[in-house]
Amino acid sequence: ERRWSVRGLHHENVLPVIGTKELVAWLPTQLGLSSDSTVIVPTTAYPTYRVGAQLARARIVAADHPDQLADSPDPDGSVDLIWINSPANPSGRVMSADELRSWVRYTRRTGAVLVSDECYGEFVWDGKAYSILDDEICGGDHSGLLAAHSLSKRSNMAGYRAGFLAGDETLISELLTVRKHSGLMVSTPVSAAMVAALDDDGHVEVQADRYRRRRGIMMSALQDAGYRIDDSQGSLYLWATCGEDCRATVDRFARLGVLVAPGDFYVAGTSQNVRVGLTASD
């Protein structure tokens, strides 16, 4: 509630996880999805959304708005799980409140589970990032909704493998049962570290200020060199292009001793964008 304007969450609504990568990879399987299931993923996305669906043998459909699903798949019942990500990896795009509400309405209509990956939500540079659990988005009804959060980004705790899932109490209870019998419990020391980090807002502001400074420097340098920055309203990345194939841009940066990620790692097919991280030390 303090950070995200989400009310009505109790311990029954929260599930600690061993880092959100593990969660993303195994959630479709833990929800009981199979070859008869359909998973919606963003068109430009973290690859593990697709990997998780593949592990469950589920069908994968890429879409960024419910309107894109009017014809395929059947909008009235064949969708089982929807992933959204705002601010997004790799593009840094921040979804509007109206977009999020559209996904909630679609979820209510289809009976799907909607999971919002909000791991970069503490780092928004333009506009505002909303949680899917915000009353303004879901009307106070968390049924069918889950929000994923990670301490790797907000608290620089990647090595701890610490995150949590929050939302629908029934889904959380079912996942808790499956996960504890699978040995996927967060250790007591890591749990204590999570509590300490989540109780402290000061270090998050320090992190955000550091990334904001780096972002300003990197944006200016890229734009001066002729690059265009697409989206990038949030997250820890700049989604940059100079209008050539992304692999040529990767090579161009490599000759300068700079490592960037090719856009075709995140999209099906070709891409002209590269992901430029803001996480290298000053």
Predicted region positions:
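Short, conserved charged micro-motifs
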Residues: D245-R252
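Hydrophobic residues in well-ordered beta-strands that form the structural core
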Residues: V41, A62, S116, V186, ...
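Conserved PLP-binding active-site segment of the aspartate aminotransferase-like
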Residues: G167, Y237-E244, L256-D282
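Conserved core of the PLP fold type I
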Residues: E1-R105, E122-F123, G127-G140, L146
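Helix C-cap/helix->beta junction micro-motif
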Residues: A56, R109-T110, A225, L256
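Conserved core segment of the aminotransferase class I/II
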Residues: E136-R212
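Conserved glycine-rich beta-strand-loop-beta hairpin in the small C-terminal domain of fold type I
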Residues: S191, V195, Y211-M219, R228-T241, ...
